Regions:
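N-terminal nicking endonuclease/strand-transfer module with a His-rich metal-binding environment
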Residues: 1-221
């Protein structure tokens, strides 16, 4: 089995990153970066085995229309350009970037099924877009996954922060009576649950493939 790896970073302008540039690199594609009026071309990059751009089942009409009749890379280009246009700040956070090592014991088809299962249960089910690519580097099959930091709304994008709800479904207030907010896309405290969700999903698919039981206790360091 490959060394377990599951890391999350933020694509942020403040660190010199761009969602469109990141998407073009991962999709090995040529994309127009509308905000800077320039073309990004990674078509000579190799290693792309599979790519998908997945939206939530209840995604707004504008998202459905945007990606209709587009290639996967084309849908990615259109969506991340819209994110780049929406975010005005010079230090804006644009996307969550996840890198995942895939198990060597699974075939490419089985790893794709594994990713689809994880995306359905942990990304799109949370209302997030999942833009993912499968790179088949020798001895290191892995996935790059970009997800949204804001909820999708009928008019575009919502707030990154939402009111924290208590067990009774009502908004939580602090001692001063003010609403308590949380990040819609999850905080650093939610990372362990997100990561563990991946390894649980991976373990399930390893078991389905008949991998011996002692391989199923893999966890990230």
């Amino acid at each position: 089995m490959a060394v377990p790896h599951f890391s999350v970073s933020i694509v942020a302008r403040g660190s010199g990153r761009s969602a469109v540039l990141s998407a073009a690199y991962r999709h090995c594609a040529k994309m127009e970066f509308e905000r800077e009026a320039r073309t990004i071309d990674y078509t000579r990059k190799q290693g792309l085995l599979h790519e998908e751009f997945v939206i939530p089942a209840d995604a707004p009409e504008w998202v459905c229309s945007m990606i209709a009749d587009r290639s996967v890379a084309g849908a990615s280009e259109a969506f991340w350009n819209k994110v780049e246009t929406f975010e005005k700040r010079s230090d804006a956070q644009l996307a969550k970037d996840v890198t995942i090592a895939l198990p060597l014991e699974l075939t490419a088809e089985q790893n794709i099924a594994l990713m689809r299962d994880f995306v359905a249960g942990h990304i799109t089910a949370q209302g997030m877009v999942a833009d993912w690519v499968y790179h088949d580097a020798p001895g290191n099959p892995h996935v790059h996954l970009m997800t949204t930091l804001r909820p999708l709304t009928e008019d575009g994008f919502g707030s990154k922060k939402i009111a924290l709800l208590g067990p009774d479904g009502k908004p939580v207030r602090n001692d001063a009576g003010k609403l308590v907010y949380q990040l819609w896309a999850g905080s650093t405290e939610d990372f362990n649950a997100f990561r563990d969700g991946w390894f649980a999903c991976q373990n399930k698919h390893l078991a389905l493939a008949g991998v011996i039981a002692d391989r199923l206790a893999v966890r990230a360091e």
